[in-house]
């Protein structure tokens, strides 16, 4: 299940991609610019959707791990939403600084990593999803600290996050049969 935070990340990535493409092609005719922008967006979407869901054997611990991963997702989403609300209020009040926003974002990422580490998952599929999510957030922490992120790297890392979400959704649906 995709929540608000992944949508924001995806929209930011797509917007950045479109903005960069538009800036690079500003001196070309409008028709060519639109074709390039659409092509770039299509490439990003293809990259995000290219990995199929992996098949795992059903185990007695599947429901346990699904519940833990969904609980992690719910708690992390609530925490992220609260942070976004706090930052929006500070922005509206004119008290938000770039440094504070970056610090809170880094705190949020580190919280995701800690929450993921604390999950006691018992299945191979659960640990696979946990690993994808952990890798995604670890890379986000690196990019926040480095302040440099290659667009292709961002797409690959977002693909990891979305793969984890799709895997969990598929896994949960397969348990209901």
Regions flagged by a language model, labelled:
Residues 2-10:
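Bacterial N-terminal signal peptides that target proteins for export
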Residues 4-5, 25, 141:
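Hydrophobic alpha-helical segments, especially transmembrane helices
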Residues 11-17:
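Bacterial N-terminal signal peptides
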Residues 19-22:
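C-terminal motif of bacterial Sec signal peptides marking the signal peptidase cleavage site
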Residues 26-100, 173-177:
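Immediate post-signal-peptide N-terminus of mature secreted/exported proteins
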Residues 65, 69, 129-130, 164:
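Intrinsically disordered, low-complexity regions enriched in Ser/Pro/Gly/Gln/His and often acidic
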Residues 101-161:
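Long, amphipathic, charge-rich alpha-helical segments that form helical bundles/coiled-coils
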Residues 161-177:
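Short, low-complexity, Pro/Ser/Thr/Gly-rich segments in the mature regions of secreted, periplasmic
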């Amino acid at each position: 299940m995709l929540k608000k935070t992944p949508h924001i990340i995806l929209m930011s990535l797509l917007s950045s991609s479109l903005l960069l493409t538009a800036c690079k092609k500003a001196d070309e005719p409008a028709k060519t610019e639109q074709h390039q922008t659409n092509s770039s967006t299509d490439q990003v979407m293809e990259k995000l959707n290219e990995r199929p869901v992996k098949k795992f054997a059903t185990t007695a611990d599947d429901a346990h791990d699904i519940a833990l991963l969904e609980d992690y997702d719910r708690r992390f989403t609530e925490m992220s939403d609260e942070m976004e609300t706090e930052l929006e209020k500070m922005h509206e009040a004119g008290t938000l600084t770039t440094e504070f926003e970056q610090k809170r974002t880094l705190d949020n990422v580190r919280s995701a990593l800690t929450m993921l580490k604390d999950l006691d998952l018992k299945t191979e599929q659960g640990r696979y999803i946990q690993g994808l999510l952990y890798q995604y957030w670890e890379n986000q922490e690196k990019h926040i600290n480095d302040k440099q992120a290659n667009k292709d790297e961002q797409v690959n890392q977002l693909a990891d996050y979305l793969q984890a979400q799709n895997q969990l959704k598929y896994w949960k649906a397969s348990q209901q049969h």
